[in-house]
Amino acid sequence: KLFNHLPKQYNVIAIDKLAHNPQYPLNDNWQNQVAEMISFVESNKGEHEKVVAVGHSFGALVSYMSACLRPDLFSALVMLDPPLMTGLARYLFRFAKKTRLINKITPAGITLLRKQKWHREQDLHAYFSKKVLFKDFDPDCINDYISSAISEQGDHMHLNFDVETEANIFRTIPHNLPTYAGKLKVPSVLITGKNTDVCVPVLRKPFLKTNPSVTHIEFKKGKHMFPLEYPVEVAHAIANVLTNINK
């Protein structure tokens, strides 16, 4: 739904399931996913075109690292509530990755409990609407999730992404952001949800300090998943950002 409300002059390209390509197996600090993103952009952008990288959470941070390494591919960067491990938190996460603690301080442990199969006659919209993660989603975004993340197989419907991979995404969250400090050369904006519990001030302030070219905007409402809670308004916010960048 968000994509449908972006300015029509933009052609949206996106990796179907980041970190699920066997050519780019998930690894620590998401280095292979950065390579996957760069390769995808190189292969899918038009000749002489540059790409506006727009990402949420995992995708936002991969977009940031990609833009730092290959600024020639991008004209702008819009990050929506990325998980920024800065300051003391990055040392905690570096240690936690070596222990089971990482399953407790990230959603990795909960992810492994995710239901993966439903009977084909079950009302999935009703099912997901009751879940904590989805309860504040725009109804159309729940439908978008169902149509993109679930496929029918015989009498049942199954998740079409790997929950172990999803858990490992959390387990390998980058703790090396200082290595990218000062490398961001493209116009960039960080948009955070007003009530986010992920990209919180204590984590984003050090990031903004080491990336002075990034402009921070606080979206007027919403939590970490605000792009799926208010897709139309977030699309308009992104459009406004791009208009200002292009002035």
What is the role of each PLM region?
Residues K1-V12:
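Short amphipathic alpha-helix adjacent to the substrate-entry channel of hydrolases
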Residues F219-P231:
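Catalytic histidine-centered segment of alpha/beta-hydrolase-like enzymes
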Residues D140, I150-P206:
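Conserved serine/cysteine hydrolase catalytic core
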Residues I13-V54, F93-F95, H236:
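Active-site loop/oxyanion-hole signature of alpha/beta-hydrolase fold enzymes
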Residues L228-N240:
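Post-His helix in hydrolase/transferase enzymes
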Residues K50-L92:
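Conserved hydrolase catalytic core segment
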Residues A76-K117:
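Flexible "cap/lid" loop of the alpha/beta hydrolase fold
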Residues L112-R171:
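Conserved alpha/beta-hydrolase catalytic His-Asp/Glu region
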